[in-house]
Amino acid sequence: MTRDEARAKIIFALDVNEFSDVEKWADLLSPHVGMFKVGKQLYTACGPAVVRMIQKYGGEVFLDLKYHDIPNTVAMASLEAARMGVKLFNLHALGGYEMMAKTVETLDKEFKGEERGKVLAVTILTSSNEQTLQEVGINLPVPEMVVKLAALAKKAGIDGVVASPQEVPLIREACGNDFLIVTPGVRPAFAAADDQKRIMTPAEAVKSGADYLVIGRPIAAAPNPAEAAQAIVAEIVAG
């Protein structure tokens, strides 16, 4: 794998809430990462303009808002996300088949085969474990529930999933290779696990078949964030 291919796999999590911080990170890291993740805090604080800010610096955007509502509401929100030109955006697989299928149908009707952002389904959050699932009445092991949701998403026409790297081989087996897998819960060896329970190193995650890796604090909190991103790229290349 080349350095450019490895770099393209890295999604930097913009865990900030100010335009000035977004501009700083977009300027600093655009040469070193493949995409920027805009989550709920940043989008609520700054709105769609933050997407345009990143695009101005040549950056691609993963709009991580995890839509979960009635089918029509999610479909219309997803349509607006796609119209903004983001590369990836997502919804919750727990919203069910109808919600996901309606979203895909709406996007297909609008774009008519033209290139659009890929829609991903969130399976089980990486902060969750068996106890978390049991608390909401789900009595399946995490890996089994993840695969069940991933298969449902593929059946509905969704482009891929967001899932823990540990579940990547199971998802590949159930859904095939033409299905995107984005993995948070990725931490290089020099970083602490923070609040995510199911984690893996970047090299391990890519080796297991992940297409994109969401990485935030290990880059942002490093003394030299650009060098940290470069070190992660080197780790992926080395395998």
UniProtKB/Swiss-Prot annotation:
CDD domains (alphabetical): OMP_decarboxylase_like (cd04725)
Protein name per its UniProtKB record: Orotidine 5'-phosphate decarboxylase
InterPro entries registered for this protein in UniProt: Aldolase_TIM, OMPdecase, OMPdecase_AS, OMPdecase_bac, OMPdeCOase_dom, RibuloseP-bd_barrel
Catalytic activity, EC: 4.1.1.23
NCBIfam families: PRK00230.1 (NF001273), pyrF (TIGR01740)
Biological role: Catalyzes the decarboxylation of orotidine 5'-monophosphate (OMP) to uridine 5'-monophosphate (UMP).
Subunit structure: Homodimer.
Catalytic reaction equation(s): orotidine 5'-phosphate + H(+) = UMP + CO2
EC top class named in words: lyase
Pfam families named in the record: OMPdecase (PF00215)
Biological source species: Geotalea daltonii (strain DSM 22248 / JCM 15807 / FRC-32) (Geobacter daltonii)
